[in-house]
Amino acid sequence: MGENDDGCSTQLIDGNGEFNVKGLDNFVKKTKLSDCGLSYAVVAIMGPQSSGKSTLLNHLFKTSFREMDAFAGRSQTTKGIWMARCVGIEPFTIAMDLEGTDGRERGEDDTTFEKQSALFAIAVADIVLINMWCHDIGREQAANKPLLKTVFQVMLRLFSPRKTTLLFVIRDKTKTPIELLERALREDIQKIWDSVRKPEAHKNTPLNEFFNVMIVALSSYEEKEKQFEQEVAELRQRFFHSISPGGLAGDRRGVVPASGFSFSSQQIWKVIKENRDLDLPAHKVMVATVRCEEIANEKLRDLATNESWLELHEAAEGGLVPGFGKKLSSILEKYFSEYDAEAIYFDEGVRKEKRLQLKLNALDFVYPSYATMLGHLRSNALESFKIRLEQSLNQGEGFAKAVRDSQQSCLMVFDKGCEDAAVKQATWDASKIREKLCRDIDAHTFFARSAKLSELTANYEKRLTQALSEPVESLFEAGGKETWPSIRKLLKRETETAVTDFLDVVTGFELDHAKIDAMVQNLKNYSQSLVEKKAREEAAKILIRMKDRFSTVFSHDKDSMPRVWTGKEDIRAITKDARAEALSLLSVMTAIRLDERPDNIESTLFSSLMDGTVSAASSHNRSVGTSTDPLASSSWEEVPPNNILLTPVQCKSLWRQFKSETEYTVTQAISAQEAHKRNNNWLPPAWAIVLMIVLGFNEFMMLLKNPLYLLGFFVAFLLSKALWVQLDIPREFQHGAVAGVLSITSKFLPTVMNLLRKLAEEAQGKTTQEVPDLSASQTYRQQSPSHSISSTISESVASNISSAGDDAEYSSPSPALVRRRNTNNVQESEISQM
């Protein structure tokens, strides 16, 4: 018996009870049984050996099971269980040809396989044809009655109720009415059912709960072949749509889907052979579990290799994917739908359970991509928040409002992105990612607020530095009684202005009052510390400042003109005033006075250092042995220690150093004054003047008696005066007598020669007086009020004498040059006489 192209006849179980797994799989593959779902039926036939079972199946379903050759004798033809597809029957119907019972080949005692195959047929088939001879009805051992009894009993023990149609085919019917035969047969079957020992759960269960009993009679195939074929054809029609309501198996239960038929058959045969306790529903669940799990795993593998999924996954790794949720939902729905289509006929509970497991596994598989998308959304939203916040702040918007608006906008975009990325089949919650985004936004807000406040504070500190540093330094350099009041006023004004502006700006941050008050106080403390720092810096340079102050007062007069020590100045008084100014500056820099607290530092310093108290007290203390020096202390009365810049001891030491370093300046001034007196003393001693008057009385009288002598002396006086002015004799002698004589000697001869040449030219009338010369003459007369004589000779001399003090010129200079030199020399002469 082999396979043909139409029915694909295959041996399912061989005579030794070995299940042909490979053959069954080939059968399922060739016939495409797995595509049928629940739309298939299984028909099995059982009966005595050589009773025409294969012949009936071949005629009934157009199969090609091997039939017995009557001419070769009666022997076993079908060994084991064979199966084939029924040709031309809808729905898909499988015919199973079982090995005949009561065969001599197995013997009387070897009935195990008969019982196993019969039980297998009832457990697997929807319709079981029981082939029996008409004349065996009513016999106890015939008609498979013992076999049916055993099968019923074992089936109740191993399987739960499964509605099966038992179609008794009475062969070679006789003249006995079919009604009588049917009644007798039903009575026999009922007796068999009643005699079966049933489990407690089915003790009162009627036969029709498990079986549909039907009876049909056929004529003899050998004697009435045509009639037999006609009756078989009529019976064949009953197998069309056999599983539809009203069909032969219309009320069947516990049907295994076609895709699980192979596995189910294997497991049933395994249970029967091992005789393990198992009911049909459990078997059904087992088959559904295995098959649904296989389908689910297959769909999961297909999902993992799906090109659309791989492209979507790769795109999600690179960045945001618009429509991610819809695309992924579509991919998942495709495989979930395929699972539903393939597992629709399996046990509903198992199917749903495995579908849920498939769903969970599939969602777990794709979740990393979803999480990546949420990560991109979070990163983009955070970056967008940063950019939007910075833009809002640059546009001058308040910090708190900018944060709220930026956060609201970014969270809205994030929520929309989450909706776009949401997978329909999943219930994933993006709230944790959103919370993390909010935490990230809060963290960035905190750092941004801190940075902005630090920047704002730094700007206002810089502003205070610019507003206070130079003015405070200038006030300290001025160093007077109004120094600290001016500093306090400046500090208060600039601090209040900065605080007011700071409050206007910081209001946009919406900080609590305590925080704002602390920041304002820090700003005030900064301005005060800035002044204190400047004060300490200036205190460190106080000695230099004191010397500068002393030098300024000592070396300049009230009009800030440099002093010329002519011998008329009171150096002692000037020195005292200069030291008083320096000491006043020292008293200003001894302590920080920002709290307007009165002190006696200045009076103590003046009384101790200017009035000589220190030196006097020191002398007295050395004799008495006690200390009453007010500066012998490390602190000032009524001055906090942290406000002290210079201690009394330091002030005393600085004053000594100051006096020591300024004594040289005073000494130099005294020396310059004495030298000036010596250089400017032109008059002879008084005794010499008296002697000259006494001895020169006769000559004086002679001059009075002779006017020509007087005129000659007058001309000589004018010439001498001209030479005096041109040679600038007082200035020359400021550098010493020897140097003055040498300088005048070198200039005297050129000046005299130039003067004589001019006089000669005037006498000969070759030179004409010009307006600029008159102007020069007038300028000279104005600058020499002590000599206002309007003599022609004096004007000529004053306008034409050219100075040769520096370049020793012998040529006559131009009138303008002569006028300029005359003017300069007259001014220098006046300055030297101050």
Swiss-Prot record:
The chain crosses the membrane at residues 684-704, 708-728. Its main location: endoplasmic reticulum. Residues 767-783, 823-834 have a biased composition (Polar residues). GTP binds at residues 47-54. One of its GO terms (cellular component) is endoplasmic reticulum membrane. It is a multi-pass membrane protein. Its EC number is 3.6.5.-. Expressed in roots, leaves, stems and flowers. Keywords: Coiled coil, Endoplasmic reticulum, GTP-binding, Hydrolase, Membrane, Nucleotide-binding, Transmembrane, Transmembrane helix. Residues 705-707 are lumenal. Residues 784-803 have a biased composition (Low complexity). Residues 37-252 form the GB1/RHD3-type G domain. It is found in: Endoplasmic reticulum membrane. Gene3D superfamilies: P-loop containing nucleotide triphosphate hydrolases. Residues 214-241 form a coiled coil. One of its GO terms (molecular function) is GTP binding. Pfam families: RHD3_GTPase, Sey1_3HB. Residues 767-834 are annotated as: Disordered. It is an enzyme of class 3 (hydrolase). PANTHER family: PROTEIN ROOT HAIR DEFECTIVE 3 HOMOLOG 2 (PTHR45923:SF20), PROTEIN SEY1 (PTHR45923). Probable GTP-binding protein that may be involved in cell development. This is Protein ROOT HAIR DEFECTIVE 3 homolog 2. It comes from Arabidopsis thaliana (Mouse-ear cress).
